[in-house]
């Protein structure tokens, strides 16, 4: 069964081919990719390598984690699997303080770590104004980024209508 490995802290100069070359020593690769910014085409500093078997993936993790590739000490571990029919990417939207998730975005565009379109106030309504997403236009979230509340200052008080579209991307349930 295929096993997907996350490779983080990549050099901006690491390409799909150089990533494959470094990992192919440890087994048969079925897929490999360095994630790139959709606007600039530049590496986002992480990628994924899929091995044919779990044993090959484990061998690569043991051998390459904290080793140098293209001048950077890379981090290698098993990729987080998403349940089938899950949230479609990102971290599943931000819920309000009381667990409400009535109008929340359900993650970017189904990519790797896509940001939701807006943040919610307690009660299930989204905050108005600002541009709270951090990953471009609902794109890929770089590991280590933590979602922040607010756009241009303190969170809005009270409740308003849910944000509709705008730069936040898709604002419905992604099922």
Curated annotation (Swiss-Prot):
The keyword RNA-binding applies. GO terms for molecular function: RNA binding. One of its GO terms (cellular component) is endosome. It comes from the Eukaryota. Part of large ribonucleoprotein complexes (mRNPs) containing RNA-binding proteins RRM4 and PAB1, endosome-binding protein UPA1, core scaffold protein UPA2 and associated factor GRP1. GO terms for biological process: mRNA transport. It comes from Mycosarcoma maydis. Its main location: other. Disruption phenotype: In the yeast form, results in slower proliferation as well as increased cell size. Does not cause an increased amount of bipolar cells and leads to significantly longer hyphae and empty sections at the basal pole. PROSITE patterns: RRM (PS50102). The gene is GRP1. Component of endosomal mRNA transport that regulates polarity of the infectious hyphae by transporting a broad spectrum of cargo mRNAs from the nucleus to cell poles. It holds the Pfam family RRM_1. This is Glycine-rich RNA-binding protein 1. Keywords: Endosome, mRNA transport, RNA-binding, Transport.
